[in-house]
Amino acid sequence: MAKLCCFGSSDYDLVVGRASTSSGKGRNNDGEIKFGYSLVKGKANHPMEDYHVSKFVKIDGNELGLFAIYDGHLGERVPAYLQKHLFSNILKEEQFRYDPQRSIIAAYEKTDQAILSHSSDLGRGGSTAVTAILMNGRRLWVANVGDSRAVLSQGGQAIQMTIDHEPHTERLSIEGKGGFVSNMPGDVPRVNGQLAVSRAFGDKSLKTHLRSDPDVKDSSIDDHTDVLVLASDGLWKVMANQEAIDIARRIKDPLKAAKELTTEALRRDSKDDISCIVVRLR
């Protein structure tokens, strides 16, 4: 991998350092693309388990915007590991510049295998992931496992770039691996009565019944594509895609937009950790 050069981000230690209740902003080298992020701890009695990445880097003459939300469960070690290693692993793939999609899929798999092999250190927990790579402001690759989501605004219309990996929609895969999907009254469907997503990093005790391969989607960025929103399910449980895009477009400052989205989720009584990144492309 070529040497990386990072720039355009304030509060750098929070951007790539640790989970916290935090906010910050940054921009690309020429200042045309700006981002803001806001993370708010949920009401559950455990430490913040959401981690994120938001930064621009230079590699092989290309400017890459790297954005991610990692929503952990049963501890923060797996999302912290992803924050440190997943993008690095993607960019290390020899074919990344020629075939980003294949490289992303390969790096997701290798990263999950590394997490499982270090489960004695990382614990029994796991994490969802949504990652977005913006190349030279012109092309976007989005990948995800779990229910963290990326939504793109094209002409003001919300376009969901990810697929929510939920147990009831992937029941056949789970049952084909020998697992089951519970559906208890008053609760969401769960893999083996435990996990509310059907794909995740980690979760060694459930891995034989889970998947960790991502869905990947790419899109050209044109003059009609103005905003990208990434968020954990703490936002999406209480807000529709179009609502989030409308807020992010109305508030021109992406930091203020991200804060408004997390604040509105709290107003709507979201109880989970809430993490949001708003990228203003135009």
Swiss-Prot record:
Binding of Mn(2+) 1, residues: 71-72
Cofactor binding description: Binds 2 magnesium or manganese ions per subunit.
Molecular-function GO term, any one: protein serine/threonine phosphatase activity
Keywords carried by this UniProt record: Hydrolase, Magnesium, Manganese, Metal-binding, Protein phosphatase
PROSITE patterns attached to this UniProt entry: PPM_2
Gene3D superfamilies: PPM-type phosphatase domain
The reaction(s) this protein catalyses: O-phospho-L-seryl-[protein] + H2O = L-seryl-[protein] + phosphate; O-phospho-L-threonyl-[protein] + H2O = L-threonyl-[protein] + phosphate
One GO CC term, this protein: plasma membrane
The protein's required cofactors: Mg(2+); Mn(2+)
Keyword ATP-binding among record annotations: no
Keyword Metal-binding belongs to the record: yes
A Pfam family: PP2C
EC number of this enzyme: 3.1.3.16
SUPFAM superfamilies, per database record: PP2C-like (SSF81606)
Residues in PPM-type phosphatase domain copies: 34-281
PANTHER family with a match to the protein in the record: PROTEIN PHOSPHATASE
Family membership: Belongs to the PP2C family.
Name of the featured protein: Probable protein phosphatase 2C 10
Species, as recorded: Arabidopsis thaliana (Mouse-ear cress)
Lineage of the organism: Eukaryota, Viridiplantae, Streptophyta, Embryophyta, Tracheophyta
